[in-house]
């Protein structure tokens, strides 16, 4: 029997519950940990945190494992949320789940678990860790539709060396089947789709509490005024919904898409048609780079990259490195490259790391 001690981050969802179950079956000394990372506005209307805790507690009781509750709200605000707001103020569209993983789930949580005397932490992420000669690799989850390696690209060797992903080799349907077979109460619970630890509340309404509306004009690329926006920080490149404008006077009924933002002028730029050339770019610049092995990939080798979650891998090459930034060129133009989002580089199933997009080029 394996008596290594592992602390499992239990969110109340089916994935982390089955992760805890599998580790218990494998003989680990398992403790569950429920993270409370958001204090404000914890209302029944928007935040399911209370129900999530009850679900986690119910599963822990069934598995006969202890469940600890830890409040990381201070760390979350300082390490994740403040940067999240700063990026939006600058006109970029950040991915808080990436920061939440690297700073909270695999830093604050890991530090806490190690201080408790644990050997490992575990989560319900669809990803895998592989170790060869002391080098840890992050691999895609076996279920391509659920693979979450994109959100984990900022993890380092120390973090991966203490991490187990118990369901990374499974498909979602198999995870739910295991949960049903063991009569876990959350076997049919729907997946969370909200921002990490902020939940399912309407995003613009939430953001408005911290970044007040600043209305301005919506322009076409030839500076024809076609509408009014609520504040450029509320919109993202490629966005179609919520623009409030119809066809042009020339009669085109193609939908409008956000193609650019000018923070200084407070102007939102739009184009008509999903395949408009202004939405396609052949290369990007990324900064704040993070490579899992500690060493950058080779320049001008053929890799693959994702510029958003669940995107099909796009063949690419890293064409230039400079300080903490790089240029990535794609074999085919990419749609809707968005500053603030992450570009993540892969070699087959291995996630090499990536960076934050700061610009794009034709």
UniProtKB/Swiss-Prot annotation:
Residues at the active site: 100, 196
Keywords: ATP-binding, Cytoplasm, Disulfide bond, Nucleotide-binding, RNA-binding, Transferase, tRNA processing, tRNA-binding
Pfam families listed in its UniProt record: tRNA_Me_trans, tRNA_Me_trans_C, tRNA_Me_trans_M
GO molecular function, one term: tRNA binding
EC category name: transferase
Substrates-to-products reaction catalysed: S-sulfanyl-L-cysteinyl-[protein] + uridine(34) in tRNA + AH2 + ATP = 2-thiouridine(34) in tRNA + L-cysteinyl-[protein] + A + AMP + diphosphate + H(+)
GO-annotated biological processes: tRNA wobble position uridine thiolation
Function recorded in the entry: Catalyzes the 2-thiolation of uridine at the wobble position (U34) of tRNA, leading to the formation of s(2)U34.
UniProt protein name: tRNA-specific 2-thiouridylase MnmA
Gene behind this protein: mnmA
């Amino acid at each position: 029997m394996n008596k290594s001690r592992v602390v499992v981050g239990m969110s109340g969802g089916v994935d982390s519950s089955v992760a805890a179950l599998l580790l218990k079956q494998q003989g680990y000394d398992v403790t569950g940990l429920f993270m409370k990372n958001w204090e404000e506005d914890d209302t029944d209307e928007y935040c399911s945190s209370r129900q999530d805790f009850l679900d986690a507690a119910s599963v822990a009781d069934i598995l006969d494992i202890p469940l600890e509750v830890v409040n990381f709200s201070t760390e979350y605000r300082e390490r994740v949320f403040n940067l999240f707001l700063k990026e939006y103020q600058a006109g970029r569209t950040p991915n808080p789940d990436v920061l939440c993983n690297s700073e909270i789930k695999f830093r604050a949580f890991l530090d806490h678990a190690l201080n408790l005397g644990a050997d490992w932490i575990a989560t319900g992420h669809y990803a895998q860790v592989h170790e060869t000669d002391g080098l840890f690799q992050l691999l895609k989850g076996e279920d391509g539709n659920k693979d979450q390696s994109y959100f984990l690209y900022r993890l380092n060797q120390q973090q991966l060396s203490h991490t187990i992903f118990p369901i990374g080799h499974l498909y979602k349907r198999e995870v739910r089947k295991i949960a049903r077979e063991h009569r876990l109460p959350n076997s049919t619970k729907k997946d969370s789709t909200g921002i990490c630890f902020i939940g399912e509340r309407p995003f613009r309404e939430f953001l408005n509490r911290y970044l007040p509306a600043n209305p301005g004009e919506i322009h076409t690329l030839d500076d024809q005024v076609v509408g009014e926006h609520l504040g450029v920080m509320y919109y993202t490149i490629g966005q179609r919904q919520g623009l409030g404008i119809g066809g042009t006077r020339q009669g085109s009924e193609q939908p409008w898409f956000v193609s650019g933002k000018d923070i200084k002028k407070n102007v939102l730029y739009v184009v008509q048609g999903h395949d408009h050339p202004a939405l396609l770019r052949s290369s990007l610049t990324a900064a704040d780079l993070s490579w899992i092995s500690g060493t950058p990939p080779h320049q001008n080798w053929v890799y693959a990259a994702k510029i958003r979650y669940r995107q099909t891998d796009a063949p690419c090459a890293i064409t230039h490195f400079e300080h903490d930034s790089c240029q990535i060129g794609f074999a085919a133009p990419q749609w809707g490259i968005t500053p603030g989002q992450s570009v993540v580089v892969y070699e087959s199933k291995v996630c090499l790391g990536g960076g934050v997009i700061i610009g794009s080029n034709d």
